[in-house]
Structures are given as structure tokens and as C-alpha cells.
Regions:
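Mobile ATP-lid/nucleotide-binding loop of the nucleotide-binding subdomain
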Residues: 93-97
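Conserved structural-core and active-site-/substrate-pathway-adjacent residues in large, well-folded domains
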Residues: 18, 41-44, 58, 115, ...
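ATP-lid-like helix-loop hinge signature
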Residues: 43-77
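Acidic ATP/Mg2+-coordinating residue in the GHKL
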Residues: 80
Length: 241
């Protein structure tokens, strides 16, 4: 075998791998991508609230016609009243794959630090626009805003803009806004069903959803009783070498 025929080897960053294989995370077409983005953002919002003993209030909207001549591009906005994210962690939390607060032995809805970043990555691939994140922690006097994208080759966040504002209320939580190429007509039945089922399994949550036709669905919490927040635990002795 000549030297010219030898195979060449190279490594891929996690971001580059999922960029090439986005269907693995459920982003195989515009309809599934719209549904999966909503699901990832809402489940992050629930984890930021009920995992810390906060009764969730989650507001979701999907808007169309934001970009002229591109009716297939939608703006997704999800707001929660959770614990918020410290500003130093916001870029990595939304724009670095395999970076997460969930790499602990504690039950949460996500495990791998991939979901919301895949929504950001798909948004970046299909629209070229950064994600916008606003967040404030419970005891903070300020709201922090970032516009971010992912450096796919190096799996690092790219900060396009950042700012902070003095809070005029006691609000705490996170707001995420991202543009995405989607197919509302094909995805809407799954999205409506997802909200109905989420309201059933989390009856302590208030969820407000506005669709692209400006129809508003309001799921009012039916109880204030919540399951105890999960605790981080030590590994089981059987799994220790």
C-alpha cells in the first residue's frame, strides 16, 4: 500500500458531530425541529423551577412572518420564573455542547447537555441568527442579556452582544428567543398534544402558549402541591469498582 492510499484520521468536536448528524437528536426535518425545540426549551424551564421548589409559570410563543419573504422561519420565545442562570455560565449553557448542570446523580428531565444546544445549532444552521438569552438569578438586582452562536469547529460559544439592565421588579428566571426554520402545519398537532400531556403530568405548573395564528391556550395550575425536589446522591455501591 502506497503512502498516498493510507487513510487520514481527524477528530470532530461534539458540535461538529451533531452538526453533521442532527437527526440523532430529533432535528431531521423542519416539523420535527420545531416540535423538538419547543420541547427542549419547555423541559429546561420546568427543571429550572420545580427542581428547586418553585411553582412553574411558563410562557411560550411561536411567531411567524418576523423575517420578510421567509414565512418558513419562526421566532420561538420561552420564559420561565426559575432560579435563573449566573451570567458567567450563560454562554456555555446555551452554546457549548456537553456542558450542563445535569452531570450529577440527580433526577432531571435532561442528562447530556445536548438538547437546547441542538435547538440553537439548528437555528444557526437554518437561519444564521444567534440565540438571545435574558436571565436573572433570584437575589440578583440585574438582568443579563446575551446573543450567542456556536463555534462549530471548536465547540465554543461565540458572544455577539452582551448587556445588563437594572431590574425594575422582583422577576427572576430565564427568557430564550431563537429563530428557526420550521413547519407549523405539520408540527402543530404534536405541539398541542405535548402541552396537554405536560399540563397533566405537571398539574402544579401554569403554562401559557400562543401559536403563530395568535390563538392562546392557558393551562392553569390545578394544585400547589409539588413533588419534593430531587437531591444529588452518591453512586450505588454495586457500581463502584
Amino acid at each position: 500500500v502506497s503512502i498516498q492510499q493510507l487513510e487520514r484520521f481527524r477528530s470532530l468536536s461534539p458540535a461538529e458531530f451533531f452538526y453533521r448528524n442532527k437527526e440523532i437528536a430529533g432535528f431531521s426535518n423542519p416539523a420535527r425541529a420545531l416540535y423538538q425545540s419547543i420541547r427542549e426549551l419547555v423541559e429546561n424551564a420546568l427543571d429550572a423551577t420545580d427542581s428547586y421548589g418553585i411553582l412553574p409559570v411558563i410562557k411560550v410563543s411561536i411567531d411567524s412572518g418576523i423575517i420578510p419573504d421567509k414565512p418558513e422561519v419562526y421566532l420561538i420565545s420561552v420564559e420561565d420564573n426559575g432560579i435563573g442562570i449566573p451570567p458567567d455560565n450563560i454562554p456555555q449553557a446555551f452554546a457549548q455542547l456537553l456542558y450542563s448542570s445535569k452531570y450529577v446523580l440527580r433526577q432531571t428531565r435532561g442528562m447530556f447537555g445536548i438538547g437546547v444546544k441542538m435547538a440553537v445549532l439548528y437555528s444557526q444552521i437554518t437561519t444564521g441568527k444567534p440565540v438571545e438569552v435574558l436571565s436573572s438569578t433570584i437575589n440578583s438586582s440585574r438582568i443579563y442579556m446575551f446573543r450567542l452562536s456556536i463555534d462549530i469547529k471548536n465547540n465554543r460559544p461565540v458572544i455577539h452582544h452582551k448587556a445588563s439592565f437594572k431590574k425594575s421588579s422582583e422577576w427572576h428566571g430565564t427568557i430564550v428567543k431563537l429563530f428557526i426554520e420550521g413547519d407549523w402545519n405539520r408540527a402543530k398537532s404534536r405541539i398541542y398534544e405535548y402541552f396537554k400531556r405536560t399540563a397533566m403530568i405537571a398539574p402544579y405548573a401554569t403554562i401559557v402558549f400562543k401559536d403563530p395564528s395568535n390563538n392562546v391556550i392557558y393551562f392553569k395550575r390545578s394544585t400547589t402541591l409539588m413533588p419534593k425536589p430531587p437531591r444529588e446522591v452518591k453512586p450505588h455501591p454495586h457500581g463502584i469498582d
